[in-house]
């Protein structure tokens, strides 16, 4: 049954999925039957479970597309783990789902540090789904702690999830568990990928190959790629090669060792790896373990990959290994050419060849039409092991540095297109890599935002390319606000990264600036207690660096938070400290502002004489500055103060 097309003109958030689809009729029927069951007081949850390579994501996408027309309020998609096993926090997923839903960014989009159901973005998502019929696809859920905070009480919504293992703690779910394809579906898949004549002329060989692959779609696709690369080989040869114990690619450890290395901090001996994302990332004992789901060496998927990898040209094999360094393992000709250091046309051709060999999954194109590809999670762990054995650490570090510098140039070029007043691009990229219009620049920045943030986080996490990472952070902080859709949470993450690098590098002035920006973002959405903590920390760093303007700004920030929290006594004290510092710096505009703020704090304490004195002092400063508009505003404030004092006198007289 063909899925129904999306509404004309509606953005499609779902992955592209494979062009050729066969089988899974029983599983689709089970999902459809489960979808129409009455919801028990909350949104219906369907779970598709299967081992890596079972085709769970493609089944989920096909099923969701077939139901999309029944959910008029939209289809939402979020991937809750990366191919490297990185676990996406539920708050981050909720923010992206809110954006797809069209919710206006606000306080809920700024992290509070809370995890789980109380995370503001999760609360906002559940509220936004109330009264709507929305279909959500949550792909590659690692644990119920990711899923539970996203589930609302709206029975009109349907949530479809995919996972490699059981999701304990979620009630009333009956997972659809995927095994291999049935024999006709496996033969149809091979026929469509290899060529009908070649398969139909050897049905016995096709059956043997399907059995050797355990009829798993991913293994069948890899062996189809091997057969296309070996036009003289018979189908029975493919089955024989796969069944025979083949040596692993040079230096490759088992995939389970790769997963252990990822979880334990790099190489399997527990030492820190300098070769990329396998650098030390030990999880706390009570935290969910992040890492790719291991594929055993005895799995047909491992054997099929080994056969196909050994047949690759050296340049394509190197690119495939280096793509494990791409943010979220998603690459296009811009990032791939930077990672391997080749011209863009060569990178584009290599990416296409790897996708044709079923070694990369093709994703939806970027906003400007650039083709994009993803390293499948089922292959990631083994590719990391191949990279660590075949590529020197210095080569890997150089590839990562080239990628960061390429991203800096792309972000800067996007900023120049969005803000022509910033001047022309001083170092334009080669033609195939360029963004050509402001619309392309804005779409690229918004569409690649998570990948850009991930690239910074990867670099900062490994602590060896802080200079390049810092330049990318600066470029993003300048460019993202120009898109008009820069979420506070994204800016918050960037300033947190600046803070981490500054503290690690012993740069208190930069740390103070980052903390001030974090405090400003928190206070802008009313998170006053968290903002006050940031301002106090900024004050400590500013004092360490003798940065008096930053000290004054931090003091004023703490005062504003105290005022908003209903503590005028502390507010007046903090305002007074900031005022003294601004006066010593000769900042008269800030002096007038702080005098007025101090007067307001005195008024809240019913200390009317002190308030009147501060207002008049502020007026005198503004008179010297020639600020007539400011003086008029203060005159109005003084008039309100006099009316309040008069009202108090009348009240006391009447009593």
List PLM regions with ranges.
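Short, well-ordered secondary-structure microsegments
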Residues: 319-326, 410, 424, 428-501
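Amphipathic alpha-helical segments of the small helical/lid subdomains adjacent to P-loop NTPase cores
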Residues: 150, 179-222, 236-237
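C-terminal boundary/linker of central alpha/beta nucleotide-binding cores
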Residues: 61, 161, 203-206, 309-406, ...
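Loop-to-helix "switch" segment enriched in basic
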Residues: 169, 226-317, 425-426
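Residue register of alpha-helical TPR repeats
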Residues: 374, 471, 510-515, 553, ...
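A eukaryote-biased feature capturing mid-to-C-terminal, repeat/solenoid-rich segments of large proteins
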Residues: 229-244, 255, 384-427, 445, ...
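Walker A/P-loop phosphate-binding element recognition
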Residues: 1-139, 155-163, 174-179, 186, ...
């Amino acid at each position: 049954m063909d899925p129904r097309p999306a509404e004309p003109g509606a953005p499609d958030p779902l992955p592209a999925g494979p062009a050729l689809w066969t089988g899974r009729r029983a599983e689709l029927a089970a999902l459809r039957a489960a979808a129409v069951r009455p919801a028990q007081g909350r949104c219906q949850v369907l779970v598709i479970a299967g081992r890596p390579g079972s085709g769970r994501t493609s089944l989920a996408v096909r099923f969701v597309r077939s139901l999309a027309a029944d959910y008029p309020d939209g289809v939402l998609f979020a991937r809750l783990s990366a191919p490297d096993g990185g676990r996406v926090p539920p708050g981050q997923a909720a923010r992206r789902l809110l954006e797809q839903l069209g919710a206006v960014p606000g306080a809920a989009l700024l992290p509070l540090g809370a995890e789980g159901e109380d995370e503001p973005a999760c609360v906002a998502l559940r509220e936004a789904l109330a009264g709507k019929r929305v279909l959500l696809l949550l792909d590659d859920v690692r644990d119920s702690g990711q899923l539970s905070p996203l589930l609302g009480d709206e029975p009109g919504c349907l949530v479809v999830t995919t996972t490699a293992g059981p999701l304990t703690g979620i009630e009333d779910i009956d997972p659809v568990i995927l095994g291999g394809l049935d024999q006709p579906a496996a033969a149809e898949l091979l026929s469509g990928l290899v060529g009908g004549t070649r398969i139909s002329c050897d049905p016995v060989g096709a059956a043997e190959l399907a059995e050797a692959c355990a009829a798993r779609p991913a293994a069948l696709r890899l062996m189809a790629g091997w057969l296309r690369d070996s036009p003289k080989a018979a189908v029975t040869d493919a089955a024989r090669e796969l069944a025979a114990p083949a040596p692993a690619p040079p230096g490759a450890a088992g995939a389970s060792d790769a997963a252990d290395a990822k979880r334990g901090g790099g190489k399997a001996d527990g030492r820190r790896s300098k070769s990329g994302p396998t650098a030390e990332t030990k999880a706390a004992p009570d935290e969910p373990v992040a890492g790719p789901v291991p594929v055993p060496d005895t799995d047909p998927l491992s054997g099929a990959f080994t056969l196909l990898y050994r047949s690759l040209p050296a340049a394509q094999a190197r690119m495939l290994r280096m793509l494990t360094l791409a943010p979220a393992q998603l690459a296009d000709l811009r990032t791939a050419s930077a990672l391997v250091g080749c011209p863009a046309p060569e990178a584009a051709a290599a990416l296409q060849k790897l996708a044709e060999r079923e070694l990369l999954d093709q994703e939806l194109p970027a906003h400007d039409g650039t083709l994009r590809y993803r390293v499948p999670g089922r292959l990631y762990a083994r590719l990391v092991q191949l990279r660590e054995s075949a590529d020197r650490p210095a080569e890997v570090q150089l590839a990562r540095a080239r990628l960061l510098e390429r991203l800096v140039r792309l972000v800067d070029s996007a900023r120049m297109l969005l803000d022509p007043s910033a001047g022309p691009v001083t170092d334009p990229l080669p033609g195939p890599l360029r963004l050509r219009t402001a619309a392309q620049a804005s779409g690229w920045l918004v569409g690649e935002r998570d990948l850009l943030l991930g690239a910074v986080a990867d670099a900062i996490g490994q602590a060896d390319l802080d200079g390049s990472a810092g330049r990318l952070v600066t470029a993003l902080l300048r460019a993202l606000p120009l898109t008009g859709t820069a979420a506070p949470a994204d800016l918050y993450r960037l300033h947190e990264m600046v803070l981490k690098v500054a503290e690690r590098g012993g740069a208190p002035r930069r740390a103070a600036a980052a903390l001030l920006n974090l405090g400003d973002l928190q206070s802008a959405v009313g998170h006053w207690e968290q903002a006050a903590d940031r301002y106090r920390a900024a004050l400590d760093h500013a004092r360490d660096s003798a940065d008096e303007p930053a000290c004054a700004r931090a003091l004023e920030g703490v005062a504003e938070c105290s005022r908003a929290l209903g503590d005028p006594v502390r507010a007046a004290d903090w305002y007074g400290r900031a005022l003294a510092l601004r006066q010593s710096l000769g900042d008269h505009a800030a002096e007038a502002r702080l005098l007025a703020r101090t007067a307001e704090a005195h008024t809240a304490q019913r200390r009317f004489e002190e308030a009147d004195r501060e207002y008049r002092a502020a007026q005198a400063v503004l008179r010297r500055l020639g600020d007539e508009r400011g003086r008029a505003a203060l005159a109005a404030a003084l008039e309100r103060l006099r009316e309040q004092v008069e009202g108090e006198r009348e009240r006391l007289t009447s009593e």
